[in-house]
């Protein structure tokens, strides 16, 4: 993991993005959600939920070492279920434009169902978002998680934005 310790203005656009996913199962919904955050590697951060825009020229990197308690801009999806045996999934995709001066799109999706269905859907959402803008896609990167509920289960996927 990269080490990061610089403090940044909340109005400075992040220049990296990391896709993460995890699952959790617990006795209550909040703990199931928390466990999925921990498994994804961002459980000790303060997530600030953002809309689905990737800053132009941001690099997609493995999750860096972010100081605990940091305020981290994050686009995410999650699905929680209390029905034992039910399968839940969450996915995130990032569509990167051919024109590197343009922003990218982050799409999130969650469902009762499997990882493949979820990831296919979230990738198609990214394609549609680019079609609506009339932009050409260079690449789509995605990740998804799937969980079969034992107590109360959660599937989680996110794009965490940070700084080099």
From Swiss-Prot:
| Cofactor or coenzyme needed | pyruvate
For this protein, the record's InterPro entries field holds: Pyr-dep_his/arg-deCO2ase (IPR016104), Pyr-dep_his/arg-deCO2ase_sand (IPR016105), Pyruvoyl-dep_arg_deCO2ase (IPR002724)
* GN (gene name): pdaD
Annotated site residues (Cleavage (non-hydrolytic)) in this chain: 51-52
Per the UniProt record, the source organism is Methanococcus maripaludis (strain C6 / ATCC BAA-1332)
- Give the EC number(s) under which this enzyme is classified: 4.1.1.19
**Which Gene3D superfamilies has this protein been placed in?**
3.30.60.30, Pyruvoyl-Dependent Histidine Decarboxylase, subunit B
Q: What class of enzyme is it?
A: lyase
Keywords per UniProt: Decarboxylase, Lyase, Pyruvate
One molecular function GO term is: arginine decarboxylase activity
A GO BP term, please? arginine catabolic process
Name by which UniProt lists this protein: Pyruvoyl-dependent arginine decarboxylase
Kindly state which reaction or reactions the protein catalyses.
L-arginine + H(+) = agmatine + CO2
Pyruvic acid (Ser) modifications at? 52
Similarity section? Belongs to the PdaD family.
CC cofactor note = Binds 1 pyruvoyl group covalently per subunit.
